[in-house]
From Swiss-Prot:
The gene is Snx11. Belongs to the sorting nexin family. This is Sorting nexin-11. It comes from Mus musculus. Pfam families: PX. GO terms for biological process: intracellular protein transport; vesicle organization. It is a peripheral membrane protein.
């Protein structure tokens, strides 16, 4: 009884937001409009989010747009920097991996800011697959759905993630660590110690992509040590989740697979 009470008390005191940027893929390879996009996996128990589990794909150009919007709406609050553009692509896999790390660091910092976390465009960016024009229309009230409805609709269409995530957890290597885990202590309460790793993993496994209609919370996040996290599963691509350090994949048929040529990717990196 004491252990269960302590777990409930700790869960009530702390909110956690976990974000991972992984699985870079080259889209439209060989064409003039080829580009690289990245899978963004988010898992949380925070009331700031409508859906507790989400997984979307975004390209670098969309990150650039997001930062501009956050900067415009944040006033004097500083917005984290994005990884810079590059004009030389001698080692494409190395460049993509460095960019992936930079994008993840950007999101980690953004999610630690209460002001930035309150921006509806950030939530649509992370928890829906709406395009940039569709996001702008939605937040301006010109879309077919509200912000919450758009997120709920996308979450319901991908509700099979929960079962897959729980299955993936049992196969994680012991050394696999979270790339980002932000705990948000509730204001006005004394923060209690975090639970042991085994208890925290059990809590992660029981989280389902349930939807929360409550408004954003006002807690300030602090970054704590990492722990185990299930890999993200994309229903459109049912293969197993990839390691975050795995080189970019080509979004082409198996009989067309082959090594990527740097000249083919000249138009991809900054889009």
């Amino acid at each position: 009884m004491g252990l269960w009470y302590r777990m409930l008390e700790n869960q009530d005191l702390e909110e956690v937001i976990t974000v991972r940027v992984q699985d870079p893929r080259v889209q439209n390879e060989g064409s003039w409009n080829s580009y690289v996009d990245y899978k963004i996996f988010l898992h949380t128990n925070s009331k700031a989010f409508t859906a507790k589990t989400s997984c979307v794909r975004r390209r670098y150009r969309e990150f650039v747009w997001l930062r501009k919007q956050l900067q415009r709406n944040a006033g004097l609050v500083p917005v984290p920097e994005l990884p810079g553009k590059s004009t030389f692509f001698g080692g494409s896999d190395e460049f993509i991996e460095k960019r992936r790390q930079g994008l993840q660091h950007f999101l980690e910092k953004v999610l630690q800011s209460v002001v930035l976390l309150s921006d509806s465009q950030l939530h649509l960016f992370l928890q829906s697959q709406l395009s940039v024009p569709e996001i702008e229309a939605c937040v301006q009230g010109r879309g077919a759905m509200t912000v919450s409805d758009a997120i709920l609709s996308y979450a319901m269409s991908n509700c099979g993630w929960a079962q897959e995530e729980r299955q993936s957890t049992s196969h994680l290597a012991k050394g696999d660590q979270l790339n980002s885990c932000c705990f948000l202590p509730r204001s006005g309460r004394r923060s209690s110690p975090s639970p042991p790793l085994s208890e925290e993993k059990e809590q992660l496994e029981t989280w389902a992509p349930v939807m929360d209609s409550e408004g954003p919370s006002s807690e300030s996040p602090t970054l704590l040590p990492s722990s185990s996290l299930p890999a993200c599963w994309d229903p459109a691509r049912p293969e197993e989740g990839l390691s975050v350090s795995q080189p970019a994949r080509r979004a082409v048929a198996a009989d067309q697979a082959g090594p990527m040529e740097p000249t083919q990717l000249d138009t991809a990196w900054d889009k």
